[in-house]
């Protein structure tokens, strides 16, 4: 189930405030956020937002294709190092 239309998309209030202030001043610098659940809105296009992945902030450049998605979708929290290799010596015995 999606979010109710009368509520609108969730965006962290402080993040939205920072983006709107930067738009008024025509500034483009990095914005750090921990809010992975925030929805990307059209006012964020062209900004670089550093989203926390649990260890560090990963910079994401917002494009028009990302509108409607969540910030956390573009920053993986887990590093996949591959499946366990087959032990051929043990298989022969």
UniProtKB/Swiss-Prot annotation:
MF GO annotations: rRNA binding; structural constituent of ribosome
GO CC field: cytoplasm; small ribosomal subunit
Record flagged with keyword Ribosomal protein: yes
Pfam families (alphabetical): Ribosomal_S19
BP terms from Gene Ontology: ribosomal small subunit assembly; translation
Gene3D superfamilies attached to this UniProt entry: 30s Ribosomal Protein S19, Chain A
Keyword Repressor: no
Keyword annotations: Ribonucleoprotein, Ribosomal protein, RNA-binding, rRNA-binding
Family that this chain belongs to: Belongs to the universal ribosomal protein uS19 family.
Entry-linked HAMAP family: Ribosomal_uS19
Described purpose of this protein according to its UniProt entry: Protein S19 forms a complex with S13 that binds strongly to the 16S ribosomal RNA.
Family annotation (PANTHER family): RIBOSOMAL PROTEIN S19P FAMILY MEMBER, SMALL RIBOSOMAL SUBUNIT PROTEIN US19M
Listed name of the protein: Small ribosomal subunit protein uS19
């Amino acid at each position: 189930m999606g979010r109710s239309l009368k509520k609108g998309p969730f965006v962290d209030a402080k993040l939205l405030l920072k983006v709107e202030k930067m738009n008024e001043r025509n500034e483009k610098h990095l914005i750090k956020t921990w809010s992975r659940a925030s929805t990307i809105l059209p006012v964020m296009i062209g900004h670089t937002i550093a989203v926390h992945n649990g260890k560090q902030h990963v910079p994401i450049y917002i494009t028009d294709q990302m509108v409607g998605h969540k910030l956390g979708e573009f920053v993986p929290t887990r590093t996949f190092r591959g499946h366990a290799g087959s032990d051929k010596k043990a298989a022969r015995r």
